[in-house]
């Protein structure tokens, strides 16, 4: 089984080799899908300070709109969701080419969460719009969903979750070391790990609120709730004991836990939503009701998905390289 993991990793490495980017100091693109890693790999992103500097709860950072005057046909153009008003008013008029817009790094849903979505979508210069947290109103043919990915940016800005401040590269090295020693999914406990109850969002808009999901699953013998908070690396290690992780919606539709768990080799259980197309071909179980989590279904889902992690195409879909290449391919038509 470990040999299969190695072949899968090698295949992903070949895909990424075509997307190596210049070194950016301590803030570089990652291997695994990460919102700011995607930003760094796009052709235009407002500059490193704009990509790196935003922190939650603050007014949107501004970018220099002149940086977008050099956009060419087929380019990928990234901006933060919170900066879309400035992009629409100041950057879009300076662009003379057909491009793809890439947005993320906030909990906004798109297109419902941005009043200027229709104006942006009507622009003949916009070929496609790839965004995190694509909501149910996103039926426009130019809109495509994009993963929220992992969270390397929080700890890069300072200590968090029992972890000292660390660069994205250092965090990913820690993750890779754990992946190298973790058991394959087929050899794990055939139960569901849950830790979402430690982060209950007060302003949750989409899906069941987390306290409600916790109450619904609390008496389920197949769901193992984490009893105490752990340092992030310890939590990651604990997750690798289980075949499944349950991942309800967060403040936004998507959740870092979903993608983090896939990288850790967990089959992820999510609620049906507008994000379902993101999970095609991945070991993700989509349920209509959390009560579907029972022993017979877990046995069936385990038999169906446990071997998926050894497939190169599954490992590839967890990387920035895959999503960058996919966006370029779809834009080219």
Tell where the protein language model's regions lie, with residue ranges.
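Conserved donor-binding/catalytic loop of nucleotide-activated donor transferases
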Residues: 240-241, 262-265
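GIY-YIG nuclease catalytic motif and its immediate N-terminal context
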Residues: 294
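C-terminal accessory segments of extracellular proteins
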Residues: 289-290
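Boundary detector for helix-to-coil junctions that initiate low-complexity/charged tails
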Residues: 1-3
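A short, glycine- and acidic-residue-rich donor-binding loop in the catalytic cores
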Residues: 256-260
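Nucleotide-sugar donor-binding catalytic core of glycosyltransferases
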Residues: 10-252, 271-275, 279-286, 297-333
């Amino acid at each position: 089984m470990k040999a299969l993991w190695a072949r899968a990793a090698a295949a992903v490495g070949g895909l990424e080799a075509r997307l190596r980017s210049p070194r950016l100091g301590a803030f570089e693109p990652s291997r695994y899908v990460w919102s700011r890693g995607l930003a760094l790999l796009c052709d235009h992103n407002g500059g490193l300070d704009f990509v790196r500097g935003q922190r939650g709860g603050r007014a949107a950072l501004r970018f220099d709109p002149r940086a977008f005057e050099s956009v060419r046909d087929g380019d990928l153009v990234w901006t933060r969701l919170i900066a879309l008003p400035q992009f629409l008013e100041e950057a879009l008029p300076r662009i003379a080419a057909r491009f793809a817009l890439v947005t993320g790094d906030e909990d906004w849903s798109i297109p419902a969460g941005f009043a200027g979505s229709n104006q942006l979508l009507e622009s003949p210069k916009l070929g496609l719009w790839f965004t995190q947290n694509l909501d149910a109103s996103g039926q426009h043919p130019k809109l495509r969903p994009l993963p929220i990915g992992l969270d390397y940016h929080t700890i890069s800005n300072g200590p968090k979750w029992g972890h000292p401040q660390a660069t994205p590269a250092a965090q990913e090295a820690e993750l890779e070391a754990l992946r190298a020693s973790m058991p394959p999914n087929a050899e794990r406990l055939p139960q569901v790990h849950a830790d979402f109850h430690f982060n209950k969002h007060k302003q949750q808009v989409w899906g069941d609120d987390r306290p409600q999901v916790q109450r619904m699953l609390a008496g389920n013998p197949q769901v193992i709730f984490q009893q105490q908070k752990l340092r992030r690396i310890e939590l990651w290690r604990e997750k690798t004991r289980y075949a499944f992780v349950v991942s309800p919606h967060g403040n936004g539709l998507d959740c870092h836990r979903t993608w983090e768990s896939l990288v850790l080799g967990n089959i992820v259980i999510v609620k049906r939503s507008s994000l379902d197309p993101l999970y095609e071909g991945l070991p993700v179980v989509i349920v209509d009701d959390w009560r579907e989590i029972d022993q017979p279904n877990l046995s069936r889902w385990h038999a169906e998905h446990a071997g998926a992690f050894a497939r190169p195409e599954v490992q590839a879909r967890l990387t920035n390289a895959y999503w960058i290449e996919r966006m370029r391919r779809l834009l080219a038509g």
